[in-house]
């Protein structure tokens, strides 16, 4: 099992700092997504079966160890929870309720009454810009991972019709447009949401630019609103 860093002192011996990074489920997300893409392109059922087995193993492993996906990985669980979209694509291709139930669980962790970070859905309805949701945004406000989670929230709306999810992503996108656009036609500063629109210069990751484009394309496809 490799779900999170349990010993920060041991990690420090290797990394020279108390590193809590664990990208296992993030990497499994892209493995799952790749299997589903090649299945949808070519129709070979072995790739769908491999995707199913991978997802079942992950869900069962979390259950067996009594670990919530929001408590895995790093950056408040966002890299791990971004598996939401391919998990829903898998549900769409199989109809297996196990994958929808797991997706619903992830959405619940993003819309919590207790306010635990990152709480992306709930916070999108607040008046605060993203970088002010919690203290020390450098510890949690990762642009790519956050937008990838919200892409999954849109997929959840597409499959379930939950309009709260659509509205949350619309509000989130409005906040990013207002507070996080940078001079490079991307969003965020370096790899974080940090009120980039207030900076006179810019630095960005290509993945942030790509996911900002993806999020707007998805919103336009779902709403027809030309602003996206």
Task: Please give the residue ranges for each predicted region.
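Glycan-recognition and catalytic cores of secretory/periplasmic carbohydrate-active enzymes
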Residues: 1-228
């Amino acid at each position: 099992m490799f779900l999170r860093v349990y010993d920060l002192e041991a990690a420090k011996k290797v990394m020279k700092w108390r590193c809590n990074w664990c990208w296992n489920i993030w990497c499994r997300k892209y493995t799952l997504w790749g299997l589903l893409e090649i299945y949808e392109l070519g129709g070979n059922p072995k790739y769908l079966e491999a995707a199913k087995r991978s997802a079942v193993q992950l869900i069962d492993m979390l259950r067996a160890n009594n670990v919530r996906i929001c408590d895995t990985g790093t950056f408040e669980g966002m890299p791990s929870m971004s598996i939401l979209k391919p998990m829903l694509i898998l549900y769409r291709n199989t109809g297996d309720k196990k994958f929808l139930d797991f997706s619903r669980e992830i959405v619940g962790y993003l819309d919590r009454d207790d306010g635990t970070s990152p709480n992306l859905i709930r916070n999108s309805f607040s008046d605060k810009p993203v970088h002010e949701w919690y203290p020390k945004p450098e510890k949690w406000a990762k642009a790519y991972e956050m937008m990838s989670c919200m892409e999954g929230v849109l997929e959840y709306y597409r499959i379930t019709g939950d309009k709260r999810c659509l509205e949350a992503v619309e509000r989130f996108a409005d906040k990013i447009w207002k507070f996080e656009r940078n001079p490079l036609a991307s969003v965020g500063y370096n790899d974080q949401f940090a009120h980039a629109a207030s900076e006179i210069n810019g630095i960005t990751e290509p993945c942030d630019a790509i996911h900002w484009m993806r999020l707007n394309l998805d919103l336009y496809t779902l709403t027809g609103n030309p602003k996206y």
